[in-house]
UniProtKB/Swiss-Prot annotation:
Transit pept. (range): 1-25
Reaction catalysed by this enzyme: L-galactono-1,4-lactone + 4 Fe(III)-[cytochrome c] = L-dehydroascorbate + 4 Fe(II)-[cytochrome c] + 5 H(+)
SUPFAM superfamilies hit by this protein: FAD-binding/transporter-associated domain-like (SSF56176), Formin homology 2 domain (FH2 domain) (SSF101447)
Superkingdom per UniProt: Eukaryota
Organism per entry: Brassica oleracea (Wild cabbage)
GO cellular component terms given for this protein: mitochondrial membrane
Predominant location category: mitochondrion
pH dependence of function: Optimum pH is 8.0-8.5.
Cofactor(s) this protein cannot do without: FAD
Identification of the protein by name: L-galactono-1,4-lactone dehydrogenase, mitochondrial
InterPro entries, alphabetized: ALO_C (IPR007173), FAD-bd_PCMH (IPR016166), FAD-bd_PCMH-like_sf (IPR036318), FAD-bd_PCMH_sub1 (IPR016167), FAD-bd_PCMH_sub2 (IPR016169), FAD_lactone_oxidase-like (IPR010031), GL_DH (IPR010029), Oxid_FAD_bind_N (IPR006094)
Keywords from the UniProt entry: Membrane, Mitochondrion, Oxidoreductase, Transit peptide, Transmembrane, Transmembrane helix
Length: 600
């Protein structure tokens, strides 16, 4: 699925048809006559003069009403052809043409702004930043909009480098490449493959801009491999207060390491120099195991595989293990053929969908899902089928458990090998729109894993069962080496340290606003439970692209204090004051996570 920044001009929108009137109003000059009371006992006979008096009174009322109506009509005359015109539905005035709507790919965060900038050259960017600094106009750096928490979004204004996407220099001998920060990962990989080069590691998807992927501390998997910011050996930063500065480990190393994972708050990353590796084919092996079996082999799995990840399926004992290693030049790929075809692997999932579709139609024939115009399920991929199954009853833990069991069967029949280039193999189909939370915590060293990574998973699965959380699959667990960037969740001064990254998820498989809100509420309940039970115990901190800002003031203060225990917040804010004193590169999220004292 192509996930890219959703940027669109707002179009004219129609107002809903006017509501039917609740009551008929009188025209100007008319009076509302109250309902007559119940008839009283017959009065004694009255004189004829009294009757005439009453008649004249009511005749006067009638004349007044007629006169008022006529006056109203002639005071506000309609055109002669008015009665022949069709009624027109009232419409709102169209929104301004320069109003841009920008959202992240999950549709969970969205802003509208008139100030959306896309410079084409470094000179354009420098002029933009200089002007914004002088006028104190906010221009928050935003990449491809893939961050689940919308960390790059700002109503006040944004700058996007999608038009600055060139490869500037390739050093084949040193395996280095210098690029503009707006280039997408896949675009870069395609451009340098002719030099026999590629990136050391990849995240799950390829549509991120290079500037964005390093600024939020993104990562791939492999206990010997660091997060992606460690591939950066030089960068050009356009700052509001000091102009364009070049940073490397030899040129202001302290600021260089701080800015590599700088959350877009220290300057706009304009150019990046990356240390690459030789392009190589990988052999991917996917198989099914259990947590008990993994405990016996965990140390070996981490140390002998270049890339490894576990995908846990809640409400089952199934763990999908995926390892990736360079293809041996001598033996090549295994010749074993898969035991099952794709059709056979999907059969159990399709059968559950057919069964569920009938069940939910019987239970509620008025329900909008499933749609009467269902697509041919034989044309749907596994992740598409999973989305449609979950959409039937996303908050029912029993139903979601059945979907997970069907997924376990799918993976058991999908075991096997696959060979491809690293940028093809290391990707992962994350499914449709979703809420996700991912934490990072220390897991010992490669030589001596602490096993706390597996303990974390055990407690998480027990929590899901105990609280009856409708937790879909997968719980994804990956590993990286340490990062030397102080703002990285995987920062460490010890070279041998390894870190585990665990992601939980809830899909948003529907466009219905009420259902999406219900799923959102349930996800944040799920996330809150993991936070309360696990984060402090394991020193776990959220991925910067997945952290969410609490609405409660006390919870926000607790989060700010917690971040101070792990990250050099004072040093980060000091650099912000020096490089961006007017905080034009900030947004609401950065301001709340790292409040800057006005007296500092």
């Amino acid at each position: 699925m192509l996930r890219s920044l959703l940027l669109r001009r707002s179009n004219a929108r129609s107002l809903r048809p006017p509501f039917p009137p609740l009551r008929t109003l009188c025209t100007s000059g008319q009076t509302l006559t109250p309902a007559p009371p119940p008839p009283p006992p017959p009065p004694p006979p009255i004189s004829s003069s009294a009757s005439e008096k009453e008649f004249r009174k009511y005749a006067g009322y009638a004349a007044l009403a007629l006169f008022s109506g006529a006056a109203t009509y002639f005071s506000f005359p309609f055109p002669e052809n008015a009665k022949h015109k069709k009624a027109q539905i009232f419409r709102y005035a169209p929104l301004p043409e320069d109003l841009h709507t920008v959202s992240n790919w999950s549709g969970t965060h969205e802003v509208q702004t008139r100030n959306f900038n896309q410079p084409e050259t470094l000179a354009d960017l420098e002029a933009l930043v200089k002007e914004a600094h002088e006028k104190k106009n906010r221009i928050r750096p935003v990449g491809s909009g893939l961050s689940p928490n919308g960390i790059g979004l700002s109503r006040s204004g944004m700058v996007n480098l999608a038009l600055m996407d060139k490869v500037l220099e390739v050093d084949k001998e040193k395996k280095r490449v210098r690029v503009q920060a707006g280039i997408r990962v896949q675009q870069l990989v395609d451009a340098i493959q002719e030099y026999g080069l590629t990136l050391q590691n990849f995240a799950s998807i390829r549509e991120q801009q290079i500037g964005g992927i390093i600024q939020v501390g993104a990562h791939g998997t492999g206990a010997r491999l660091p997060p992606i910011d460690e591939q950066v050996i030089g960068m050009k930063l356009v700052t509001p207060a000091k102009g364009t500065i070049e940073l490397s480990k030899d040129n202001d190393p302290e600021l260089f390491h701080l800015a590599r994972c700088g959350l877009g708050g220290l300057g706009v990353v304009a150019e990046v120099t990356l240390q690459c590796v030789e392009r190589q084919e990988l052999l991917e092996h996917t198989y099914v195991s259990t947590l008990e079996e993994i405990k016996k082999n965990h140390k070996k799995l981490l140390s002998t595989n270049k890339h490894v990840k576990y995908l846990y399926i809640p409400y089952t004992d199934t763990v999908v293990v995926v390892t990736c290693n360079p293809v041996s030049k001598w033996s090549g790929a295994p010749k074993d053929k898969p035991k099952y075809t794709t059709e056979e692997a999907l059969k159990h999932v399709r059968d559950l969908y057919r069964e569920s579709i009938v069940k939910y139609r019987v239970q509620d024939s008025s329900k909008k899902t499933p749609d009467s115009r269902e697509p041919d399920i034989n044309e749907l991929s596994f992740t598409e089928l999973r989305d449609k199954l979950i959409a039937l009853d996303p908050l029912n833990d029993v139903h979601v458990g059945k979907v997970n069991q069907a997924e376990a069967e799918f993976w058991k029949k999908s075991e096997g090998y696959r060979v491809g280039w690293s940028d093809e193999i290391l990707g992962f189909d994350c499914g449709g729109q979703q809420w996700v939370s991912e934490t990072c915590f220390p897991a010992g060293t490669l030589a001596k894993p602490s096993m706390k990574d597996l303990e974390y998973i055990e407690q998480l699965k027990e929590l899901i069962q105990k609280e009856a959380i409708p937790a879909p699959s997968p719980i994804e667990q990956r590993w990286t080496g340490r990062s030397k960037s102080p703002m990285s969740p995987a920062f460490s001064t010890a070279e041998e340290d390894i870190f585990s990254w665990v992601g939980i998820i809830m899909y948003l498989p529907t466009a219905d606003p009420r259902q999406r809100k219900d799923i959102t509420d349930e996800f944040f309940h799920y996330r809150h439970l993991t936070q309360a039970k696990l984060w402090d115990q394991y020193s776990a901190y959220e991925h910067w692209a997945k952290i969410e800002i609490p609405k409660d003031k006390e919870e926000l203060e607790a989060l700010q204090e917690r971040l101070r225990k792990r990250f050099p917040v004072d040093a980060y804010n000091k650099a912000r004051r020096e490089l961006d004193p007017n905080r034009i590169l900030s947004n609401n999220m950065v301001e709340k996570l790292f409040p800057v004292s006005k007296t500092a």
